[in-house]
Amino acid sequence: MDASTRVVLDKLKVAFPQGPPAAEQVRGQEFAWGRSQWEKRWPAGMYRPAALDSQEAVAVSRRDVHRRAERVDTEADALELYLLMAAWGTGTKARAIARAARPLQEEGVAATLLQAHSAARSEEPADCYAQMLRGGSLRIKHLGPAFFTKWIYFAGFEAGSSGRARPLILDARVARTLGWATWGWSASSYARYIAMSEALRDAWCPEAPTDVIEYALFTANGA
């Protein structure tokens, strides 16, 4: 383990004095979601996910999004997953919802999301990340790394296999704990983050999936 990764490990041990969070706790991480805000911002004429009209769920958990991400075969499936992922990522804050809904106005967004889902399940995380950056073949205008890494994570984490790294979410809170700038991450930075997370997992909670590390980095928020 290099010195910078060891510094991050020390931060996590301070933030979690009782030990690393359990994988079940991570999967149970949930947020209330602002259905009415999403209804107002969903593009007219676009396929409308049933969740917008359902009154059943008042919160969305990681587990819920992972389950929906297991099978995405059509553009409609991709839009349903995007809504669930973005609802989990924004909660009830109107400004955050407005930002997350903006990419849906882009032409061909559903087709690109479907392609990105497939890429996340078959390619190395950093390669998929590079394709979703500005200038990449899977670039969606107004969809930045803090959100498209959520897409890569939910699409590809459970599809990880031996020899291929598992994708993780990288946002400002995670970056702050890493001691990084809170924006402008390159594909090589994302690859470095994935490698650091694996090293941190091996040193701190070797039996856990690496999203336990991402959750801990997010929760610590630079502490």
Question: Model segments located where?
Answer:
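Structure-specific DNA junction-binding interface
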Residues: M1-A98
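Helix-hairpin-helix/helix-loop-helix acidic hairpins
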Residues: D73-E80, L84-K141
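C-terminal accessory module of base-excision DNA glycosylases/AP lyases that mediates lesion recognition
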Residues: M1-A44, A146-T149, G156-A223
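Amphipathic alpha-helical packing elements
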Residues: S137-I152
